[in-house]
Amino acid sequence: MARAHWGCCPWLVLLCACAWGHTKPVDLGGQDVRNCSTNPPYLPVTVVNTTMSLTALRQQMQTQNLSAYIIPGTDAHMNEYIGQHDERRAWITGFTGSAGTAVVTMKKAAVWTDSRYWTQAERQMDCNWELHKEVGTTPIVTWLLTEIPAGGRVGFDPFLLSIDTWESYDLALQGSNRQLVSITTNLVDLVWGSERPPVPNQPIYALQEAFTGSTWQEKVSGVRSQMQKHQKVPTAVLLSALEETAWLFNLRASDIPYNPFFYSYTLLTDSSIRLFANKSRFSSETLSYLNSSCTGPMCVQIEDYSQVRDSIQAYSLGDVRIWIGTSYTMYGIYEMIPKEKLVTDTYSPVMMTKAVKNSKEQALLKASHVRDAVAVIRYLVWLEKNVPKGTVDEFSGAEIVDKFRGEEQFSSGPSFETISASGLNAALAHYSPTKELNRKLSSDEMYLLDSGGQYWDGTTDITRTVHWGTPSAFQKEAYTRVLIGNIDLSRLIFPAATSGRMVEAFARRALWDAGLNYGHGTGHGIGNFLCVHEWPVGFQSNNIAMAKGMFTSIEPGYYKDGEFGIRLEDVALVVEAKTKYPGSYLTFEVVSFVPYDRNLIDVSLLSPEHLQYLNRYYQTIREKVGPELQRRQLLEEFEWLQQHTEPLAARAPDTASWASVLVVSTLAILGWSV
């Protein structure tokens, strides 16, 4: 599970806003957070002074006759990660957390975020800002109704509110005599001015054919075929998510951190292809790739990114029907299309199609995971040698694993910010160390590594938790129950077209048996050199049904607040299951190839079926990764792999431990203190 944002996938709100929702932030000490109750207020050095920027913003609000202005923390494409160019909320507030909304009135300013970021907000915001510890539109609107007068106008950038978010604000304000006002010129941008980072300008390039599952022409033809088969026969499909355009044309760039995308829209009609982007970024080779020997309906017209609203409005004047996926379309696009000309589904045909990988895409993703396993194994071997020296901290460790991945063939950087967490930090949501704030790795503590890579042939995401010393009995039990959950879901056979939410509980059952649980989702889709969190695959209530060819992560966990955290994450391919009797059934094929920590496994808790599965998995790891290690003369890592994939044998529970439990339980029943 990568560090999550509101953007790339709406499921992340469920996966992560609830994840560890009751864990306590790191206690940074009273002098590390602001204290606005003193005179003068105490402000740590991490605070940003926002007085001048707020004054300038309010002047802009006056020119628009606004009583309030909403500043979301997203961009125009609901990206999971956003570029510096789009970090408006962070710039105006000083708060850089990946989730949260700011609202400014003529007299007050406030930020709403969830428990993951409360301490961070108190460290970064000055006393111009109130911190509200709720999320969603309802608490924001409740606050607005008390702060702005009747007749007040609430402004927003329509390209920063999704259709659903706009509808929730609009509904909440109905009957209040306050008006929601769409303003296409972003007011924060006007204040930011020349200090605002520029839009990235690196080349947009075509993937080599070896790394694509289909040509872009085949993909376009497939989408047009779906248009013709749709009940409402749309004349066009509008693509707003950056991953959609990148996938459709097999194009990549580096506009977004950790994601190989470029700012773009696509309007694919039954007779034309219009790609909205910065044309100057297309080399002659890329332009030729798009239009070499093309005929009318298969020629790509590149139009300026800024013209998308005007172009869609002009197209909408005709006898047309525009098909959109509402989950990724912003209100700024939606408001330009007459409602009678809209064809809406939750997800666009591109989002649905790319969720199911063809045989070539499957092979590419599997190959990337073999090389990724080499990088992770190299790191684990390096840790075993260096942690006892006391020279490794969370941040330097993250740098090393990123370095090892960068040395792998076809590497294009990490797929998210590495989560490198030791001891109690592993129990914190989205903990990522910094050079200034980190914890030393110790042989006496558990260590959680959640990391992934972008490769030309695939995107990876894997989590392993290890302990180099003597773990407690409870740590071993918790780890083993998490492992059992991973195995139970990975080996499950279920009917085709079953939704992920129907089987998700199998990953929790072993934890539930002991009264344990985890607060986050159990998995997410993953792309081919695209998003590390690829919607709409996964185990949430609003994910689509599982189908052969989908890839998903499987990642149960357990988090002991203030002590340790455990997560075991693998990526798995949905495949046909072999059953005794004929039928349409599916199961998972795990494609992550790094062994689990034997030091943390209590074999006595494993059933014969669990052991059989685990030993088969270890044999697969040997077969897939072993030859690659040998080919590259990584002999120390090969020996490590052999040791850590030795077959596990069944073992009876520790009778002494059970006797101790029995004695303690008996004394407790008798009412004696122990």
From Swiss-Prot:
Residues carrying a glycan: 35, 49, 65, 278, 291
Binding-site residues for Zn(2+) 2, renumbered to this chain: 461, 524, 555, 569
GO biological process: proteolysis
pH effect summary: Optimum pH is 7.4.
Topological type in the membrane: Lipid-anchor; GPI-anchor
Broad enzyme group: hydrolase
Lipid modification (GPI-anchor amidated alanine), residues: 649
Keyword Protease attributed: yes
Binding sites annotated in the UniProt record for substrate: 116, 430, 524, 533, 555
Regulation of this protein's activity per its record: Inhibited by apstatin and the chelating agent 1,10-phenanthroline. Also inhibited by high concentrations of Zn(2+). Not significantly inhibited by bestatin or phosphoramidon.
Gene Ontology terms: cellular component: extracellular exosome; extracellular region; membrane; plasma membrane; side of membrane
Propeptide feature: residues: 650-674
Pfam families: Creatinase_N, Creatinase_N_2, Peptidase_M24, Peptidase_M24_C
Cofactor: Zn(2+)
Main location as per UniProt: membrane
Annotated SUPFAM superfamilies: Creatinase/aminopeptidase, Creatinase/prolidase N-terminal domain
This enzyme's EC code(s): 3.4.11.9
InterPro entries membership: Creatin/AminoP/Spt16_N, Creatinase/aminopeptidase-like, Creatinase_N, Pept_M24, Pept_M24B, Peptidase_M24_C, Peptidase_M24B_aminopep-P_CS, X-Pro_aminopeptidase_P
Location relative to the cell: Cell membrane
Disease tied to this protein: Angioedema induced by ACE inhibitors: A potentially life-threatening side effect of ACE inhibitors that appears in a subset of patients taking these drugs for hypertension and cardiovascular disease treatment. AEACEI is characterized by swelling of the face, lips, tongue, and airway that can lead to suffocation and death if severe.
Role this protein plays: Membrane-bound metalloprotease which catalyzes the removal of a penultimate prolyl residue from the N-termini of peptides, such as Arg-Pro-Pro. May play a role in the metabolism of the vasodilator bradykinin.
Protein known as: Xaa-Pro aminopeptidase 2
Organism phylogeny: Eukaryota, Metazoa, Chordata, Craniata, Vertebrata
Gene: XPNPEP2
